[in-house]
UniProtKB/Swiss-Prot annotation:
Listed InterPro entries: Ribosomal_bL35 (IPR001706), Ribosomal_bL35-like (IPR021137), Ribosomal_bL35_CS (IPR018265), Ribosomal_bL35_sf (IPR037229)
Keywords assigned: Ribonucleoprotein, Ribosomal protein
Taxonomic superkingdom: Bacteria
Pfam families reported in the protein's UniProt record: Ribosomal_L35p
Bias (Basic residues) ranges: 1-15
Sequence segments annotated as region (Disordered): 1-20
GO cellular component, one term: cytosolic large ribosomal subunit
Family assignment from sequence similarity: Belongs to the bacterial ribosomal protein bL35 family.
Organism (species): Nocardioides sp. (strain ATCC BAA-499 / JS614)
Coiled coil: none
Protein name: Large ribosomal subunit protein bL35
Length: 64
């Protein structure tokens, strides 16, 4: 039986830590930043852990 392919879109969006947690970038910081407050754009920086509801789906896409 052939190997399952990793979902290329998911592999670009998610990163798996050593402990198995899935990290994602925060949304909304690509464009139209001029009208967003500095406080808001600062909150959008960095990575955060994926929501529990989405973990199962993401793991399947990543082939974990």
């Amino acid at each position: 039986m052939p190997k399952n392919k990793t979902h290329s879109g998911a592999s670009k969006r998610f990163r798996v830590t050593g402990s198995g947690k899935i990290l994602r970038e925060k949304a909304g910081k690509r464009h139209n930043l001029e009208k967003k407050a500095s406080k808001v754009t600062r909150r959008m920086t960095g990575t955060t852990e994926l929501a529990k509801a989405d973990v199962k789906r993401a793991k399947k896409m990543l082939g974990l």
